[in-house]
Amino acid sequence: MIMLNIGPFSFHSRLLLGTGKFPDFDVQQKAIDVSEAEILTFAVRRMDIFDAKQPNLLEKLDVKKYTLLPNTAGAKNAEEAVRIAKLAKASGLCDMIKVEVIGDDRTLLPDPVETLKASEMLLEEGFIVLPYTSDDVVLARKLQELGVHAIMPGASPIGSGLGIVNPLNLSFIIEQATVPVIVDAGIGSPADAAFAMELGADGVLLNTAVSGAKDPIKMAQAMKLSIEAGRLGFEAVRIARKRCATASSPLEGMSVVE
């Protein structure tokens, strides 16, 4: 498969895995291992990265194996998002940041105005910027025009497991994209992840679908395989849909039985 390129980074895996809500560190580590994800995302606000006495994910991981993608979850405006991003960078983490500015507490949908503003501010600060956005086609284009390094449209509300509720909009975002499109939020099953990849997405970021599964380790492996299968299917190019049947067996050269 073709590698996933984000800014100066290249990755074999197209699965980006969130690290929250796992039952314990052991299950989390095993799920990460079997997923073969190379990018791990986490909320800076949920982790006291400056307190050596506070156990956290970074102590348990061989961080040299992964690219860490801190996110600005909890930010309500652009200024808060920038402040969180700078905190992550000051701690020595990767300067790649997932911009997450929530505008509605019920749906957890992003604030489009503040997301645009935060992305612009962080680009000026030299960050590699990956904004979480809705499936708004125009907003995705405006973010792209700013110079962000990837677009991360949600398939459906965060943690809902509803899958891709608006494949048409998602396909429009993918068709106009000049940067990677990583489907983020709402994925519930391996079929959802495969569908996103078949639409032409460059990657899938998920968390709850794995951490909330009855068997997170098996689900992590299932997601890995479904994303690989979906991408291979996209690269292979599926047959055209037709209204009528087409025989799959050749008719030429067949003997006629009387």
Swiss-Prot record:
Catalytic activity: [ThiS sulfur-carrier protein]-C-terminal-Gly-aminoethanethioate + 2-iminoacetate + 1-deoxy-D-xylulose 5-phosphate = [ThiS sulfur-carrier protein]-C-terminal Gly-Gly + 2-[(2R,5Z)-2-carboxy-4-methylthiazol-5(2H)-ylidene]ethyl phosphate + 2 H2O + H(+)
Binding site for 1-deoxy-D-xylulose 5-phosphate: G159, A185, G186, N207, T208
GO cellular component annotations of the record: 2-iminoacetate synthase complex; cytoplasm
GO biological process: thiamine biosynthetic process; thiamine diphosphate biosynthetic process
Domain of life where this protein originates: Bacteria
Top EC category: transferase
EC number: 2.8.1.10
Gene3D superfamilies referenced in this protein's UniProt entry, alphabetically: Aldolase class I
A single MF term (Gene Ontology): thiazole synthase activity
Pfam family, one: ThiG
InterPro entries in UniProt: Aldolase_TIM (IPR013785), Thiazole_synthase_ThiG (IPR033983), ThiG (IPR008867)
Main location: cytoplasm
Database matches in HAMAP family: ThiG
Family according to the record: Belongs to the ThiG family.
This protein's name: Thiazole synthase
Organism: Bacillus cereus (strain ATCC 14579 / DSM 31 / CCUG 7414 / JCM 2152 / NBRC 15305 / NCIMB 9373 / NCTC 2599 / NRRL B-3711)
